[in-house]
Amino acid sequence: MDRIVIGRKAFRDKVFACWLGKNIGGTLGAPHEGKRFALALDFYDPVPTKAAANDDLDLQLVWLKLLEDEGADPPLPRLAEYWSRYACSYPWNEYGFFMRNWSRGLRPPVAGCFENYFVDEMGSPIRSEIWACLHAGDPQAASRMAWKDSALDHAGGEGMWGEMFWAAVEAAAFVESDPMVLIHVGLAMIPLASHVARSIREAVWCRENGLPLGDARERIAGRFGHLQPCNAVPNHGFTILGWLYGKDFGDRLCKAVNCGYDTDCTGATLGSLLGILGGPAGIPAKWREPIGTAIVLHPFTRGFKPPATIEELTERTVALSEKAATGKHEIAFGAKTRLPEDVLTRLFRNDLAVTARGQDVHMGVEVCGGREVALHYGGEPVLRPGIGRTVWVMIDGREAHVELAVPAGWTAERLGPARFRLFSAEPVADRNQVTVTAPGVGAVPFTVLGPGEAKGFPAGDNVAKCPKCQARVEACICEGGCSCRAK
């Protein structure tokens, strides 16, 4: 079978332009984030002297380190561990609630959805580029990694489908340039009835039926708009509008950002995609010169040495991508890009994405002895007194005979080799440990919450922040100490 061969020089150029476009689009949109009305930008306003610090890029630098340390296919718990080390101070929306659940002992993917109002937001769709570059020309593999990433803080929500969509689109864009083909590649990876997919299709319908851009924008806002400006559903429609209605790099970015809402994210995502499609030559100097190529890190991203420039980020990304390709039979790097006749059929393959999105998000996953151990809660990770709760265990995706130790006063009635009914007639403590033991694996602890730790959280509210540094109270970055944790 002929391979998809990607030319090394062209690939390096596209990766560079991807990251540069990310910085440009994010910097364009950053001053206007949260404005839920149409704008009229035709350039940066204000004109910057450097790139804006942006979690859209920063969090992918954490994944860069992870991939360099752990290899191209880290298990889900490793992603969670790296976030907890290097990005735990972020308090915003879904980020804060993932870390709130993590600190209570829960593990993803259930830690990414339990009591998390923000699973439908943009925090994970903006992290797609690292997976697209890692799996250039292999959309389903990029989408599979995007599922893992988004399971941290958007498990089962629209943000998950958004990241899977963009990872696939961007991965395919290294070898295909037709917007409609790319959009349908992305849609092939996500559920048909997801609201993100509906918003994207509505944007396409508007363009194909000749609606003026202003009318198209109002149509998306009217049918998919949300109280939260960072909700993924309208923002995906707006990004597609900018792409399809714009004439060139700058015009497309401005048209997307001018739709309002989560403007730094729509701008950054579209900027990345346009960078992949057009390479450095497609980015006019007037857009590049104000920000240069230095990477400006947000203070909440800390504890490791990130790339200092887009050039360094490009070289490190390319090295990872070439290493990942060595294990593939259908993707290779060479002197020039060469595509097989059935390239479109290959781009639309979605087996890995379908398998990924079919996974249970009501489970916690740990790694022990190189094995993935999952405790399936069958819903919320909570035991209430007097109510039996069936849980089950999977090891590397399969049921195996395990033992389950539970707290004093609980019972664990065995229903099968790996299935148990938990019960407590007495009041249940706020945080409880159950321990899975299996031959060749060892003992793996998981947390089950009691009703006192599962009282909910007001929809739309954020976790507590330090009044000085604005970080999560539990991960305050104030120098010299701070009293915020005692309040």
Pin down the residues of each PLM region.
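Gly/Ser-rich oxyanion-binding loop with an adjacent helix/lid
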Residues: K65-W161, L253
